[in-house]
Regions:
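Short sequence motifs at beta-strands and strand-loop junctions characteristic
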Residues: 2-7, 124-129, 225-227
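Strand-connecting loop/turn motifs
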Residues: 7-9, 21-25, 37, 150-152, ...
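Outer-membrane beta-barrel architecture
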Residues: 13-15, 135-137, 158, 234
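Transmembrane beta-strands of outer-membrane beta-barrel pores
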Residues: 18, 32-39, 140, 159-166, ...
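Extracytoplasmic gating/loop element in the C-terminal half of outer-membrane beta-barrel translocons
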Residues: 21, 25-146, 154, 179-219
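Short, solvent-exposed loop/turn and secondary-structure capping segments
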Residues: 40-45, 166-173
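Outer-membrane beta-barrel "beta-signal"
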Residues: 226-239
Length: 239
């Protein structure tokens, strides 16, 4: 898929306007915008093909047998390597990485359906986001001159992301976890990438963390101004 392809989008608007008592008028509008927040790749941290481009090699999506064998997690077909301190203390075991990676796969709709395959370019899709915008205009009319020319003073209130005002968990934007800054996620480090390419060595992996936290989902809520509601007040004189 191309990176700009948006799977689905819904746009709707409803508006009601009325004048009353000769000198007043009110317009209320509600707009809805819903869409997935775009697409992204799921890549290896290092390059697999030896062409010098990092973070652009689409991962192989493992099956359960690749991560878990008869003896437990980390005993499957794939080889994972412990995270260790300089003193050799294990901080994130290969077995735990395999279990967490499998849970991560199961939490993503695309990955869950495509185990045992190479990830498709821009195959992962961001969660659906719905936002409502509320606009209220209050008009005050007055008339001047012999011909009773109409003048309007209009007070406006625009509530952007009105849904977030009602509930802080609504209308949030989404950001990709363990991202590379370009909308792609890089959850898997291929430690011996060059040796795999040049010598045919068996790949050795490490499952990355999301900062200091265990990586559990492809996307998480994005705490920024784009996720919060805002109010814009306006004053217009129409003549």
């Amino acid at each position: 898929y191309a990176s700009y392809v948006m799977p689905h989008r819904v746009v709707a608007n409803i508006s009601y306007s009325t004048d009353y008592a000769k000198y007043f008028g009110t317009t209320v509008s509600l707009s809805y915008y819903g869409s997935a927040n775009g697409r992204g790749n799921i890549d290896y941290v290092k390059n697999v093909f030896g062409d010098g481009a990092y973070n652009y090699s689409l991962i192989d999506i493992p099956t359960l047998e690749d991560l878990q064998g008869a003896e437990g997690w980390g005993k499957g077909n794939w080889t994972f390597v412990d995270f260790k301190t300089k003193d050799g203390e294990v901080t994130y075991s290969a077995a735990q990485q395999c279990e967490d990676f499998w849970n991560y796969i199961q939490n993503d709709k695309y990955l869950r359906k495509h185990t045992g395959e190479v990830a498709t370019r821009n195959g992962i899709v961001a969660p659906w986001r719905s936002t409502f915008d509320l606009k209220v205009n209050q008009n005050f009319y007055f008339f001047t001159g012999a011909n009773h020319r109409k003048h309007t003073i209009q007070l406006g209130v625009d509530v952007e992301n009105f849904s977030n005002l009602l509930n802080s968990s609504w209308g949030n934007a989404w950001t990709i976890n363990a991202g590379d800054g370009y909308g792609n996620t890089i959850p898997l480090n291929l430690l011996n990438a060059q040796a795999v390419y040049t010598k045919g060595e068996k790949p050795q992996f490490q499952f990355q963390k999301n900062g200091d936290n265990i990586l559990t989902e492809t996307y998480s809520r994005y705490n920024s101004l784009s996720s919060t509601w805002s109010i814009i007040l306006s004053l217009r004189y129409i003549f």
